[in-house]
Amino acid sequence: MPTPPDAAPRQLADDVHVFDAAFSVGGLDLGGRMTVLRLPDGGLWVHSPVAFTPERRAAVEALGPVRFLVAPNLFHHLNLPDWSAAFPDARVVAPAGLRAKRPALRIDQELDDTPDPAWAPVLDQMHIRGMPRVNEFLFFHRPSRTLLVTDLAFHFHHADSWALRLYLKANRAWKRLAPTVLERLLMKDKEATRASIQRALKWDVERVVVCHGQVLEHGGQKALHDAFAWL
């Protein structure tokens, strides 16, 4: 049986692969994206797992042994149970607050502003403060200059759904990296969020991999600055 198209990874750079998958919220097909990074020891660090399928499992296993399964915020955890069951030796990593929200979910360690020694040689991380209902962490893969963004901002330059296009245009988030109105409303302490973004702008970002939308291959630092210049 041929491999389904969305089960095959795309290589963006050395040690950086992404898996795209269908994902809908409120009738809007936002799509989802999982990023798989190969760490210096050869193990895999999996960001925001998409829906589990045997085909995706096989494709991930072909890249290396899974060491970490990462929920980057309080929303992107729905597929962790299936992936953690498939890879019981992998450590499940999540932000503070997810244990209380999903007590049945196995969580082995909580994220903070200090990268784990296993990924610190190649990966920086930062807690976006001022958004307690989201508790999102940004991650920056230094070797490839790749920033991983979950729900903080979308990046859609094309969409098949007219409803999604209309939604994004109404949110001033069409054909640019930008937060939606919902994300803006979730910023309860804008000064704290602004300070977090300013710290992220110190990273030498070229590529931005969003979980919803298309990968931004170039000009990531300027796009990030422009997305939050209103703050």
Model-assigned labels for residue ranges:
Residues 22-26, 44-50, 68-72, 123-129, ...:
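Short, flexible loop segments at the rims of nucleotide/cofactor-binding pockets, characterized by
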Residues 58-118:
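Active-site HxH/HxHxD metal-binding segment of metal-dependent hydrolases
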Residues 109-134, 191-193:
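Active-site glycine-rich loop that binds ribose-phosphate moieties when present
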Residues 47-48, 67-74, 93-95, 148-151, ...:
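Active-site neighborhood of phospho(di)ester-bond hydrolases with catalytic His/Asp-centered motifs
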Residues 2-4, 8-10, 24, 45-46, ...:
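Metallo-beta-lactamase
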Residues 12-16, 40-44, 117-124, 143-146:
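Beta-strand-turn-beta hairpins that frame and shape the catalytic cleft
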Residues 1-41:
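Zn-dependent metallo-beta-lactamase
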Residues 24-68:
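Pre-active-site segment of Zn-dependent metallo-hydrolases
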